[in-house]
Amino acid sequence: MKAMMVVGTTSHAGKSFITTAICRILARRGWHITPFKGQNMALNAYVTTTGGEIGYAQAVQAWAAGINPRVEMNPILLKPQGNMTSQVILGGKAAGITTATNYYEQYFDKGWNMIVHSLERLAVEYDFVVCEGAGSPAEINLKHRDLTNMRVAKYLNAPTLLVVDIDRGGAFAHVVGTLQLLDESERALIKGIVINKFRGQRSLLDSGIEWLENYTGIPVLGVIPWREISFSAEDSLDLLERRRKEQKEINVTILRLPHIANFTDFEPLDAEKTVSISYLDLNEPLGYPDAVIIPGSKTTINDLIALHESGIAKQLQDYVAAGGIVLGICGGFQMLGEMVFDPDQLEGNNVSYAGLNLLPIETVITPEKIVRQRHTCSVYPYPGFPITGYEIHQGVTRSSKSPHQRIKTTNHPLFEDGSLGIVNDNQSVWGCYLHGIFDNGAWRRNWLNYLRNRRGLPSLPTGIANYREQRETVLNQLADLVEQYIDLTPLLNN
């Protein structure tokens, strides 16, 4: 199977960005290609048409390649849960929860076999695979059990691109150090270096590049300038850097939960020119934005406890009582109710926990994980729009059965499938299980218009395309940028 690999000197060097761009570049040239990342650690996940769970970044790369995401593109997904544990997703299915030490004892051989099997299946259908590494390929304490960097490159005999982030400083040292820590057979696969996120005059790098090429014997194939292009972040390090202060017509606050998951849900909101998004730490005052979103969570109960202990829970209750709007998605939806029950103690040491008391519902955490794509139609905020999204959760939510129910309101279904979400009588509290809900353009605009009309602002047009069309524009922008500044010829000719 013909292949190439993209690795980085550090995390966040730009591997995903460049891999995605290369997928789109080659697809535009008519190549029948597929992305691949043997093992990914991320909280942003996507559900394939077969009900398998993969990293969201690999789904984006598949779309860049012009194909549908599938589990073979990311056979191992690790979803951190806190307390040094992660949920292991093998071949798209939850396989268990483990620590880092136990993971390699339990899953190393099984994981490598899964990687090889996935590559063999992809080889049957695709002519070329663009592989992405993880972290750094030169972590000395991890190299012997690294499943996703040079082990994959050597298996495929793939010419490899080494990416370095110069914006952090120390780029030349990062490159030289990484190469020195690779063994000879691994270094032989490195066919080019890319300097990413460069700010300033390109000619100032010339002497450094000349030295680097002479010292390493490896050509610098490109210098990518810093560009403000919206791109799916893989984990919360990027999220922490996204603190938008600019106020716009509609201001939405998203709670930065300790175990936040699937915050890629909010990219379509971020792309709305009249909407300002800010992520709020739980030790900050809530204020009075136009809406507050409680996002998905990898551990609903732990994040619910954090909301209570931080005082945000009480602030949310006061905010709603004063006329504010709250939307909970997935784990955030589960938190909105009166109680969350955990009879098997899957997430905590108790069997019941007080919710936020904003909706007359209760949730029971269950061992079975629901992972599936969904297609339905809207009921609120406007009926009849086709809706697509996906569920990833453990737990069943139902109307509260408490004889002392405190919340005197009626639940109204958000969608024709009432199990997917509800809204209360005065449309101040919304909850849904659907990830990707804002990808649905007409639904997103109608929900935003509801917020706008409350402020006396005119409605925006609702006859707009879904976010996938905007994403296509972004993918083409990424490809244009990389194609302009990187010479891929040495990698493709090999």
Curated annotation (Swiss-Prot):
The active site is at residues 330, 435. Pathway: Cofactor biosynthesis; adenosylcobalamin biosynthesis. InterPro entries: Class_I_gatase-like, CobQ/CobB/MinD/ParA_Nub-bd_dom, CobQ_GATase1, CobQ_N, CobQ_synth, GATase_3, P-loop_NTPase. It comes from the Bacteria. GO terms for biological process: cobalamin biosynthetic process. GO terms for molecular function: ABC-type vitamin B12 transporter activity; catalytic activity. Residues 249-443 form the GATase cobBQ-type domain. PROSITE patterns: GATASE_COBBQ. Keywords: Cobalamin biosynthesis, Glutamine amidotransferase. Pfam families: CbiA, GATase_3. Catalyzes amidations at positions B, D, E, and G on adenosylcobyrinic A,C-diamide. NH(2) groups are provided by glutamine, and one molecule of ATP is hydrogenolyzed for each amidation. NCBIfam families: cobQ, PRK00784.1. Belongs to the CobB/CobQ family. CobQ subfamily. This is Cobyric acid synthase. It comes from Crocosphaera subtropica (strain ATCC 51142 / BH68). The gene is cobQ.
